[in-house]
From Swiss-Prot:
Heterohexamer of two PFD-alpha type and four PFD-beta type subunits. Residues 144-163 are annotated as: Disordered. SUPFAM superfamilies: Prefoldin. It comes from the Eukaryota. This is Prefoldin subunit 5. It comes from Saccharomyces cerevisiae (strain ATCC 204508 / S288c) (Baker's yeast).
């Protein structure tokens, strides 16, 4: 992200288009980042919901399907519905109580919410800049068209005065 200020009024249409293209690429990057954060937040929220469901009284001994991969499930049985294996990253798991596991995932959700707000603010700012650049492109095109029209009128006056 560039923090350098550019005077858009001093750029020609080609330069304005290049700046707009750069802003559009940055905007696309931030939009994709926001989507990734939203997906991760959804997964952590789902973990919280699953822990709450499994840890309810009476669920001990219940049968369930345990995901072994994205498309493979293994039959399982809840032995202790008060303890959970929590993925803390890079393939490491830690046993936590239901309350501690929920707190762990809630902390992650809160962090992602904060980051999402920051990215949304950046997206709004980039969108406003992009719209401003579009307006400058239109103005530059109008100025260019007016200059060409004026030049043609002067050319026609010269031709009519020499004829």
């Amino acid at each position: 992200m560039s923090s350098q200020k550019i005077d858009l009024t001093k750029l020609n249409p080609e330069q304005l288009n290049a700046v707009k293209q750069q802003f559009d690429q940055e905007l696309q990057h931030f939009t994709q980042s926001l989507q990734a954060l939203t997906m991760a937040k959804g997964k952590f929220t789902e973990c919280i919901d699953d822990i709450k469901t499994v840890s309810q009284a009476g669920n001990e001994g219940q049968k369930l399907l345990v995901p072994a991969s994205a498309s493979l499930y293994i039959p399982g049985k809840i032995v202790d519905n008060k303890k959970f294996m929590v993925d803390i990253g890079t393939g490491y798991y830690v046993e936590k109580s239901a309350e501690a596991a929920i707190a762990f995932y809630q902390k992650k959700v809160d962090k992602l919410n904060k980051e999402s707000v920051q990215i949304q603010d950046i997206i709004k700012e980039k969108t406003q800049y992009s719209l401003s650049i579009e307006a400058q492109i239109r103005q530059a095109a109008i100025r260019q068209h007016e200059a060409m029209s004026k030049q043609q009128q002067q050319q026609q006056k010269k031709e009519s005065s020499t004829a």
